[in-house]
């Protein structure tokens, strides 16, 4: 095996998906603890350790205790290199989250054992399903009261349309939580409370049919054995092939806060989740073990470093090897650039990088020329596909508090739009600026970042827009005719694409009927 093939085989790149408050930040922290990336897992609200154990680093996130921006953390575990991509976990999330899921090979779904499948989880699973992403599931908060585990598995199957195969099974919960039983390995992992902040070796009891197991379970023993018979009769057995196709999820139980069960999940990612996968480009499919470098940008983040007004483009490497000082072709611009200072990530601790392989995420300094979806290669003209823009669902008109700052406002919005934090539209018929977002919090984020980073204060007004559609038409004459007729509702987005801002659902349906030659698109690929 070549060095490169060996490096690729070691990599696992995954994201965590969950509904707000299911325990995602805690599990992120505990995963980093497993990978020895941090020495002490502090609780998120009061971290004083040098290496912040989490990715909540922007001003507004610090105040709200939610992870708004996707962050990337790399750590070693059992001879492997794990790349963990954090996704926004709050009520309201942006396209950032969707796009992060295009940069991973598998995902870890965290469910709150007391609540089960929640709306945000459903939305994220829909995105994973577009690419048949393999999913590992962790049912969290066993140190509290949870719903009946069989009921939880039924709900995963019914609502998320994926087969659930339990790997471990909980012994009691809340005050009676005794640990988990490994179904195929026939052993118990004993839960001892109070070790949430440190790495400890869990006690193992071999064989359920043993005196030690009977002592540990006490009067719960008979009931547990009966429950297990039911579980083994009713549940799916784990099939690695079905998991890799995105049809089945292995399910683990534990408590992230108690640092219990998290290592089982990480072992599953290393043992079962795929190494970096081939990627589709317009021209051909790119294999991760190819010698020549290629990668695509899935996110742009402004101002990661308050000391430098910089913007970082996050790139997923798809093939080859990044080495310091190498020359890359920026495919969209057809220009060659030399990259000497790519970054690797440990949350906001940024370190310079010597080399990286397929599956790794690196950060490129961006001076305004890189956009989301851009492909970089070692000379070949490639364009990776599948990095979408989604039509926003909410719209506001932007009003400046200080009219003299319109230049800063436009620059700020243009940069934030490139970064994917919002979408910006410039109507053809006036000088309005319209913002579009997937969730309400995005508007707050944009206003607070304009104020913090660009020193521009703005307010929002309601606007009569129901949805946006990108316009495509190969017939120039028809397009001109359409533009003349639909002028009142046309706008150009931040990337210069013609967009139709529909005031109502009915209006959009009528337009689609009236103009069959025009394509009204709800998503567009980044080009």
From Swiss-Prot:
Main location: cytoplasm
Cell location: Cytoplasm
A Pfam cross-reference name: EF-G_D2
Protein name per Swiss-Prot or TrEMBL: Peptide chain release factor 3
Stretches assigned to the tr-type G domain: 9-277
Cellular component aspect of the GO annotation: cytosol
Domain of life: Bacteria
A molecular function GO annotation: translation release factor activity, codon specific
Repressor keyword on record: no
Keyword Iron recorded: no
Annotated binding of GTP, by residue: 18-25, 86-90, 140-143
Function description: Increases the formation of ribosomal termination complexes and stimulates activities of RF-1 and RF-2. It binds guanine nucleotides and has strong preference for UGA stop codons. It may interact directly with the ribosome. The stimulation of RF-1 and RF-2 is significantly reduced by GTP and GDP, but not by GMP.
Membership in a protein family: Belongs to the TRAFAC class translation factor GTPase superfamily. Classic translation factor GTPase family. PrfC subfamily.
Keywords: Cytoplasm, GTP-binding, Nucleotide-binding, Protein biosynthesis
Any one biological process term the GO annotation gives: regulation of translational termination
Record InterPro entries: EF-G-like_DII (IPR053905), EFG_III/V (IPR035647), G_TR_CS (IPR031157), P-loop_NTPase (IPR027417), PrfC (IPR004548), RF3_C (IPR032090), RF3_dom_3_sf (IPR038467), RF3_GTP-bd (IPR041732)
Taxonomic path: Bacteria, Pseudomonadati, Pseudomonadota, Gammaproteobacteria, Pseudomonadales
Gene3D superfamilies attached to this UniProt entry: P-loop containing nucleotide triphosphate hydrolases, Peptide chain release factor 3, domain III
